[in-house]
Amino acid sequence: MALLEDIINFATLNPMVVVAIPVFLFVISLLRSYLRLAHIPGPFAAGWTNLPRFSWVLSFKAHDIHTALHRKYGPLVRFGPNMVSVGDPKEVGHIYGFTDPWMKSDFYHALLMKPRGKPIPGIFAAQDENIHRALKKPISSAYSMSTLLSFEPYVDSTMRVFCEQLESRFIENKKPLDFGKWLQMFAFDVIGELTFSRRLGFLESGEDINHVMANIWETFKKTSLVTQMPWLDKLWTNNPIQRWRRGGGASPGAAFAMARVEERRELQRTTNKNDWHFNTRDFLSRFMEAEAKDPSIPPYALAAWASSNITAGSDTTGIFLRTIFYQLLTHPETLRKLREELDQAAAAGNLDDLASWKQTRELPYLDAVIKEGGRIHPPFGLPYERVVPAQGATICGKFLPGGTLVGMSAWVVHRNKELYGEDCDEWNPDRWLKCDTEKRRKMENALLTFGAGHRTCMGKHIAYLEMYKVVPTLLRKYDVSRLLCFLVSRTG
C-alpha cells in the first residue's frame, strides 16, 4: 500500500511520468504483437499495422498485390500484425474443413446487414456457428441441385427476354452495346425470378433499376476496406449519417429484398393464403414455409435469406459471366473450339436452341471453359478469414498461436504454379482436359471460387445453372466475336 502511495506521489510530482507510462505500455504491447508472428515473412510495415493491407484494397489491386507477395515470400505471408495469408492449396481442407470448423473473424462483421445500426446475422457473414446452423438448416434443401432444377423454367423465361431485348435493341438496329452491363442485368433478373417469381425489370427497361447495381458496388467498395480494419465500421460505414442516407441503415441490396418480402407479406395478409398460384414455388415461398413450420427461427431470418440471394446471387454470377465472355472474346481459338463443340452437339440433336442443364453437362469443353473462368477471375478478391483455434495450429510447417487470423485468397491459390502449371496466369481451359484424373481432382478441390468447406456459398448451384445455360445459348444464337463492334445473329 505504501509502495502504491509512493508511486502516486512520484507521478504527481513528475507529470512526465503520467505521459511516459501509457506510451511505454503501448510500445511494449506493439512489440509483443510484432514478435508474436515475427517468424512469418512479409512486408516490414505489415508486422506493425493493418494500414498496408487497407491501402492494397484501396488501390483496387489487392488481389494482384497478394499474389505478388506470395511469390516473393512463399506460402505464408504476414499481411498484418495478427493476420497471415496462406497460399498453399494443400491447406484448404485444414483451414476450411467440415470437421472442427474454424470461426470466422471480425472481417465478416462489416458484411452484415445493419438496419438502424444493429447487425443482423446472415448465412455468409455469421461468425457464431450456432447462428449459422440455425439460419442454414431450414432452407438448405432449397439450394440443392435437384431442387434448383425445378427452377430451370425461370432461367429459361429470363433467357428468352434477354435474347428478345438483345435482338430488338441492338441486332436489328446494329447498335453497339455494353455487353458486360447486360450480363449483369440478366443475372439480377434471374435471381428476381428465382426468389420472387418475377423479374426485377432490368432487362425490359435496359436500366439499373433504382440504381441497385451501382449502389451495391459502392457498398462493396466501402465494406471491403472496412474488412481490413473492422473497428472502422461504426466510424465510417455504420455511423448515424450513413444510416440516415441509407434510409434506416439497410444496404441497397438488403433494402430492395426487404421491400419485396413486405410486398409478399401484404399479399398473404390480404388473400389469407400461403399459395399465390405460382407454377413453381420460388425461394421466398420456401423461406416463408420454413418460417411458418419452425417458431424458433429468428424474426430477422426471412430478410437475411432474401437479401443474401439478391446481393450475393446477382453480383457473383454477373462477374463470372463477364469473365467468361471477356476471355472468349480475347482468345479466338478458345471461342472457336467451344463453338465447334456446341455446333456438333446441336447437329447430333443433343443441344436445343435454349440449352438445358442436362444437355450442357455432357459438353467437356464448355465445362473446362467455365471452370477456367472461375479459376482465373474468382468473384471474391480477398482472403476468406478464419481464427486459429485457442490451441494454435501448424500451417505450412510453421506454428501459428491461437487467435491468429488466417485466410486464403482464391486469387492466390488459383495461381499456384505447382498445382495449376507455369502458365497459371494465363487463360487455358485445356488444363482441365489434358491432365489425369488425380490431378484434375486436386485442381478442383483447390478451387475457392465459391469458398470451401461447410461455409461454401449456398448459391453456387444457382450460378452454375445460369452459366451452363446462358453461355451455350448465346454462343449458338449470336456471333459474339463481333461484340467489340456490335452483336449480330448467326442465323442471318
Swiss-Prot record:
Pathway: Secondary metabolite biosynthesis
Cofactor(s) essential for the protein: heme
Disruption phenotype: Abolishes the production of azasperpyranone A.
Membrane topology field: Single-pass membrane protein
Enzyme Commission number: 1.-.-.-
CDD domains named in the record: CYP57A1-like (cd11060)
Pfam family, one: p450
An MF annotation (GO) of this entry: monooxygenase activity
Its biological purpose: Cytochrome P450 monooxygenase; part of the cluster A that mediates the biosynthesis of azasperpyranones, members of the azaphilone family that exhibit anti-cancer activities. Azasperpyranones are synthesized by 2 clusters, A and B. Cluster A is responsible for the production of the polyhydric phenol moiety while the azaphilonoid scaffold is produced by the cluster B. The non-reducing polyketide synthase ATEG_03629 produces 5-methyl orsellinic acid, which is then reduced to 5-methyl orsellinic aldehyde by the NRPS-like protein ATEG_03630.
Compartments in which it is found: Membrane
TM helices/strands, residue ranges: 10-30
Name this polypeptide is given: Cytochrome P450 monooxygenase ATEG_03631
GO cellular component: membrane
Record keywords: Glycoprotein, Heme, Iron, Membrane, Metal-binding, Monooxygenase, Oxidoreductase, Transmembrane, Transmembrane helix
Family the UniProt entry places it in: Belongs to the cytochrome P450 family.
Residues binding heme: C457
GO BP: secondary metabolite biosynthetic process
Induction: Expression is induced by the azasperpyranone cluster A-specific transcription factor ATEG_03638 which is itself regulated by the azasperpyranone transcriptional regulator ATEG_07667.
Gene3D superfamilies noted in UniProt: Cytochrome P450
